[in-house]
């Protein structure tokens, strides 16, 4: 009976923290990490999110962008898609927290990169785009968006890259990866140091201090992003490119 209880806790830890994920799907502590691990995971306040290992180091990112004109950033910068179109099925948010039009998340070090400050208590994220945890549902809409809209053709869309990724070995046999919502992406940023340490421990690609795309929408011309340089959460035009890192929920 003791062995059974240990296995269950080993399979799905209940303590808040960042873990690495083995090939069999087990979550294990960072101290047991090696390059055979397929992903990292964060558990916090009831949310369990698996974070993809390699981002644009994946062959699928290159495949998805192979038909585009050569540019230095075409394999890691992507459109949200269909600039000028309001996507039915994705809720629009015009505030970060129900009050402010932008804000700054608390860094794992304990400081903020600017004001206004966003509460570190994610249970208080009950309004505005931070209340959006529906990345999987949002992504089902974005998977159907394969053009930038109008004359915007410099980048692939995040949905197109996701489709290509899911159809490739890069998905590690999982078919439920998706583009994180703003709430999910914000949670990752708040644990960025630990997440990047875990990615390094499994020879993965660290999240960079750049613009990261969420699946949350602002209006027909804008979507929500998190700037991983300073934790700023704000809107960005759909015709501009951003990085994307796929995630999946752990049941």
Task: List each model region and its residues.
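Conserved short hydrophobic patches within well-ordered secondary structure
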Residues: 42, 62, 178-180, 185
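Short, compositionally biased
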Residues: 2-173, 238-251
